[in-house]
């Protein structure tokens, strides 16, 4: 309902004004690790391309319902943000695994907390231009496709919002949507 979307916008605006959510000063990736019941999963948080979604480089395996897509579209339009994370899976690549694991070993997380549900969440910012370039190149050359594990409606809605905003001539942020990429060896 519009009331729910308005509350989401109010909450997002409050997080931004309190500097809980902020725009990084330069591009970065985030390494995200969650630990639940002694099992760890680590993925890479980034913006994935709407073009990749539309060109089937992000593989879908379920149909979406128009009313659920419209709900997500209304949320994006009201908040002015794509806040729903889409979880993508890919066939693991040793070089990417090593790079991510080395980054985690050599640095402290920028966020590390245990939520009320007992799940530990840790986040590392990858903000070194050379490392960002290496990660980007490894994905471009060694990960030809990803698969939607969760978030079919969120991904479809991101593509529809971009189309409504002018397609390839849309505002800069509309070309990407929030994703976390998990290698197959991290899926439990």
Give the location of each predicted region:
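A cross-family signal for N-terminal binding/gating loops and helix N-caps
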Residues: 1-188
